[in-house]
């Protein structure tokens, strides 16, 4: 029987060297590669396809862009998904990619699933949370062989595999429609200032336009549906916002991130659309949700983000959290006006047919509320603190 293994394939260094390794070191007869398009550059998809056609036994390229935005990004927006300041583009993409790999593996009759993740990062966990729901073997050559990037570069050259990474410029890039991450090489030194050349989606504040860009974003039930009055599909909307915000220098993050395993990592991200859409959505929520809803939702959001970051999207608790979030978003409909200027984002205004804000009630000139009625409340505000002072004698 022909032994087949299905490999999650990006076209990068790690997954490219996995192909000969799976044959030479693990004894598989055929390596089936699967690339999943979640918004990578078209050229990257084309190169991955061309490379895989030469070095793998069979290759799939699966278009999952709309599915990614609809089923992963929009729920993230509704949840105000954020892990330590990271918008989790890579985090939420991995489970979808893994599921597509499993589907292809079953179609091909593969007996094993493989990925090119290292033993130090989070992606191994995200892939395997999905892979291990099957009865197939799971293989992680990078982790199991304890490979270094330098070894991989040399191995690739020995096997005639073209790679873009070099020893002098070894950083790696992971990109989808929601975010672009740049890591590795000198970037791992937190004291090293990243060169401007690593950024592709965003202009520096110095190079951004000298005039601010004002944008209106329409939401329906927590989901962005239009930019400046133009209705757009999910993928098209995120793509357009990436272009608008990136042009104005909005959406860069340089951070120290706590990985699931406990390691701290220096990460550089570009996420223009995510920065704007998340800020606008959170602002609109403040207009339409009650104080109690907002307070409790923050607890839910933190748990949701922790689980999404770890790739635990198939956990029953994650479904429970989404059920609450979806219910909370039924009234989150309206428009938010933002200003983008030289790397800064400013919320200018917001409106909603479901607004709980009443200009008449809060106005200094309004007589709708009798101010004297607040006296009884004021008398007992801070009551326990006053009792404490009496008891301790201070």
UniProtKB/Swiss-Prot annotation:
Subcellular location: Cytoplasm
Keywords (A to Z) from UniProt: Amino-acid biosynthesis, Arginine biosynthesis, ATP-binding, Cytoplasm, Ligase, Nucleotide-binding
Annotated transmembrane regions: none
Predominant cellular place of this UniProt entry's protein: cytoplasm
SUPFAM superfamilies from the UniProt entry: Adenine nucleotide alpha hydrolases-like, Argininosuccinate synthetase, C-terminal domain
InterPro entries: Arginosuc_syn_C (IPR048268), Arginosuc_syn_N (IPR048267), Arginosuc_synth (IPR001518), Arginosuc_synth_CS (IPR018223), Arginosuc_synth_type_1_subfam (IPR023434), AS_cat/multimer_dom_body (IPR024074), Rossmann-like_a/b/a_fold (IPR014729)
Record GO terms (molecular function): argininosuccinate synthase activity; ATP binding
Record GO biological process: argininosuccinate metabolic process; L-arginine biosynthetic process; urea cycle
Catalysed transformations (reactions): L-citrulline + L-aspartate + ATP = 2-(N(omega)-L-arginino)succinate + AMP + diphosphate + H(+)
Chain sites annotated for binding L-aspartate: 118, 122-123
GO cellular component: cytoplasm
Top-level taxon of the source organism: Archaea
Record-listed ATP binding positions: 8-16, 116
Pathway: Amino-acid biosynthesis; L-arginine biosynthesis; L-arginine from L-ornithine and carbamoyl phosphate: step 2/3
Record has Ligase as a keyword: yes
Binding residues annotated for L-citrulline, in chain numbering: 86, 91, 122, 126, 172, 181, 257, 269
Record note on quaternary structure: Homotetramer.
Family the entry assigns: Belongs to the argininosuccinate synthase family. Type 1 subfamily.
Name listed for the protein in its UniProt record: Argininosuccinate synthase
Species whose genome carries this gene: Methanosarcina mazei (strain ATCC BAA-159 / DSM 3647 / Goe1 / Go1 / JCM 11833 / OCM 88)
Lineage: Archaea, Methanobacteriati, Methanobacteriota, Stenosarchaea group, Methanomicrobia
